[in-house]
Design a protein with these regions (language model features):
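Short, active-site-adjacent cap segments at secondary-structure transitions
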Residues: 22-23, 55, 126-128
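Short, flexible helix/strand-to-coil boundary loops that buttress conserved ligand/catalytic motifs
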Residues: 26-27, 61, 130
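PIN-domain endoribonuclease scaffold, especially VapC-family toxins
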Residues: 39-94
Length: 155
């Protein structure tokens, strides 16, 4: 994502953060991606969610490996969902590039339906659509988290 793309619209970029990126930002607050939480809470980015992607986040936060009690899960959701814009996915969903993993389709549908500027992911199947580079697919780029953060810092 270039500064020119953001500047043209003169508004914060609309972004889809896949579940693993969100987990890194929320659960691992000392991690490299914790900065994302400050970005959405300050209005520097607009995270997009759909019913399907929000349900996946709720389900994954309940995995035993995270050792999060219901109260902790609610707190983490409260650190994200109030800042997210809910996007309704049409039926049938919009056309998106072919993807090897059908579980990744909700993120592609969300990016296309929500007019996202970026789909931020470390997922190999999603990145393979863009040949592992930040490259525009339809109207949005599929980009690694660190590259996305660098693009914001360079703006």
């Amino acid at each position: 994502m270039t500064a020119a793309r953001r500047g043209r619209r003169n508004r914060p970029p609309r972004v889809v953060l896949d579940t693993n990126v969100l987990l890194s930002a929320l659960v691992f607050s000392g991690g490299a991606l914790a900065r994302l939480q400050g970005l959405w809470q300050s209005g520097a980015i607009v995270p997009l969610v759909s019913t399907t992607t929000a349900e996946e986040l709720v389900r994954v936060l309940a995995y035993p490996k995270f050792k999060l009690d219901p109260g902790a899960r609610q707190e983490l959701l409260a650190d994200h969902l109030p800042w997210a814009e809910v996007v309704e996915i049409a039926s049938p969903p919009p056309p998106v590039p072919a993807c090897r993993d059908p579980f990744d389709l909700p993120f592609l549908y969300l990016a296309a339906s929500g007019r996202a500027e970026a789909l931020v992911t470390g997922d190999a199947d999603l990145l393979s659509i863009a040949d592992g580079k930040a490259r525009t697919v339809r109207s949005f780029v599929i980009v690694r988290p660190h590259d996305f953060l660098a693009s914001l810092a360079g703006a």
